[in-house]
């Protein structure tokens, strides 16, 4: 009698079910290369309690989680509990809980930043980042907080003084004890009721919430006073401040809605759209951000000789004057050029916009300043119907600033006079700031090269945000505070760049690079990114994809 032997389980290599072309291997090899080149970042700690979950297993695991839209610590814990093969490989079959994952994110933000910088350096060495043209853009990201849980400056000071005044007297006859009893037991009191009503009218529900928290115990009182101090440190004018995330600023988004947001600035390389630099700011506009971005780019690209392209939102005269003296070239449209482009796009994508305008409004639209073409050679403005505005001899001075004025004497007899001029002047005039530096920047933008560079800005700079929101499924910030938000967005940028690398570089190329680094390490000891400069190599490229690394 033959007995068939049955086996209900078998031991196998956990990675045998993963496809060789999987995105997992891009993450795996990139991290291995990073670890081989930066061993000092993974040295074992010499003091304190030894960590069970070391950064060399946690960093690739967290990055791989972001690649799969698994971001929160709880979701990451539930992910490996489902016995995913990729998690077993990266974690070496260990089982970190959500508290361990959160501890890693808090303690190793510098390691995450170093990995982000390494990805950019790797792109430069392999040709995935050209470094010659950078596109900068910014967007508002909604803070992880409720717009209605907020306080104004006067409400905050009133609440702070109230707590300081009454929290010192905690006897049974004191107001602090009676208020605690009122909120805990909801007992009606003729003495407390009018005070609470007055507080509700003054500090609203948000202030009452903080007051309730401070009444619990000594620890809660200390935490509330610390929260009030943090809110006070982030006061900006008369704008409201969120009590949930005080570092998120009250800004108006592109839809015209007010809310608590962060301003996220990103620089994208022109070659394949990799993010070269990014940071979070609390400012409500982009006007002074170009100089800040230059500092990040200079450090990461290792040079200041490149071109940065931005939109008119970055037009800030003092910043442009400083930038003009630097080796970095800027391509930026002036207000007139930006308005003309916006009108052309509106006409192309929203033709119904002009359907509801009267005949007079349509005629006035034709004679707006941006419809007058500037002839640099003859230094004149040419109107829609051929009218020429010449430059006046005298400069006009307003608030200490000199302006060139262009006008014509033919306005009185012109049939378009009612639509082209204003009633006060009855004459068409165009004023231009008399500034040689600004004129040089404008002419650089109007040149054929400037137009070609700016033409690609939308697909690169704004396309990066579209990729983050659509292809990368980024739906908003899930952390609070500038530091934590910046760490979260660093992981998001790493995810974006690694997917770009996976798209434009074959797995076998990454594997070859890792093998050569290990080989050089055995022969020469410690190595760094300079090893790419010592190699005699070239990449075989086919259809914008690096398919092979050839070493001489």
Where are these regions (language model features)?
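Hydrophobic alpha-helical membrane-insertion signals
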Residues: 1-24
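Anion-binding and metal-coordination hotspots
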Residues: 4, 48-51, 57, 62, ...
């Amino acid at each position: 009698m033959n007995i068939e032997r049955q086996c209900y389980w078998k031991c196998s290599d956990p990675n045998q079910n993963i496809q060789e072309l999987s995105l997992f291997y891009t993450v795996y090899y990139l991290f291995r290369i990073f670890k081989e080149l930066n061993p000092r970042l993974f040295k074992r700690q010499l003091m304190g309690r030894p960590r069970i979950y070391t950064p060399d297993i946690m960093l690739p695991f967290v990055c791989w989680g972001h690649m799969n839209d698994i971001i929160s610590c709880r979701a990451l814990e539930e992910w490996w509990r489902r016995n995913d093969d990729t998690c077993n490989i990266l974690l070496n079959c260990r089982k970190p809980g959500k508290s361990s994952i959160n501890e890693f994110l808090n303690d190793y933000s510098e390691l995450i930043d170093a990995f982000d910088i390494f990805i950019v350096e790797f792109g430069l060495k392999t040709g995935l980042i050209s470094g010659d043209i950078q596109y900068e853009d910014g967007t508002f990201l909604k803070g992880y907080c409720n717009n209605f849980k907020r306080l104004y400056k006067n409400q905050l000071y009133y609440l702070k003084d109230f707590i300081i005044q009454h929290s010192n007297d905690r006897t049974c006859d004191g107001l602090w004890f009676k208020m605690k009893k009122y909120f805990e037991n909801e007992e009606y009191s003729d003495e407390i009721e009018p005070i609470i009503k007055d507080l509700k009218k003054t500090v609203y529900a948000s202030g009452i919430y903080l007051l309730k928290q401070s009444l619990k115990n000594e620890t809660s009182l200390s935490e509330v006073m610390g929260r009030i101090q943090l809110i006070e440190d982030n006061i900006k004018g008369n704008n409201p401040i969120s009590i949930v995330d005080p570092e998120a600023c009250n800004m108006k988004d592109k839809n015209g809605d007010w809310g608590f947001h962060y301003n996220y600035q990103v620089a994208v390389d022109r070659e394949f759209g990799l993010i070269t630099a990014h940071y979070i700011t609390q400012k409500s506009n982009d006007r002074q951000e170009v100089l800040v971005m230059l500092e990040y780019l200079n450090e990461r690209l290792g040079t200041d000789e490149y071109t940065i392209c931005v939109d008119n939102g970055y037009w800030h005269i003092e910043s442009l004057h400083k930038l003009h003296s630097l080796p970095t070239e800027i391509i930026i449209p002036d207000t007139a050029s930006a308005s003309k482009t916006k009108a052309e796009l509106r006409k192309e994508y929203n033709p119904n916009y002009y359907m509801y305008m009267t005949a007079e409004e349509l005629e006035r639209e034709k004679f707006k300043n941006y419809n007058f073409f500037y002839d640099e050679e003859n230094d004149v403005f040419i109107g829609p119907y051929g009218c020429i505005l010449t430059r006046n001899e005298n400069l006009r001075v307003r608030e200490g600033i000199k302006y060139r004025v262009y006008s014509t004497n033919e306005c009185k007899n012109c049939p378009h006079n009612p639509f082209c001029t204003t009633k006060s002047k009855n004459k068409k005039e165009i004023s231009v700031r008399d500034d040689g530096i600004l004129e040089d920047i404008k002419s650089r933008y109007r040149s054929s090269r400037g137009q070609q560079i700016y033409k690609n800005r939308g697909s690169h700079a704004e396309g990066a945000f579209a990729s983050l929101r659509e292809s990368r499924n980024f739906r908003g910030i899930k952390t609070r505070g500038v530091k934590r938000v910046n760490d979260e967005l660093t992981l998001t940028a790493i995810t974006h760049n690694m997917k770009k690398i996976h798209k434009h570089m074959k797995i076998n190329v990454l594997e070859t690079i890792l093998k050569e680094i290990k080989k050089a390490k055995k022969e020469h000891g410690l190595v760094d990114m300079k090893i790419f400069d010592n190699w005699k190599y070239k990449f075989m490229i086919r259809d914008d994809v690096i398919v092979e690394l050839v070493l001489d």
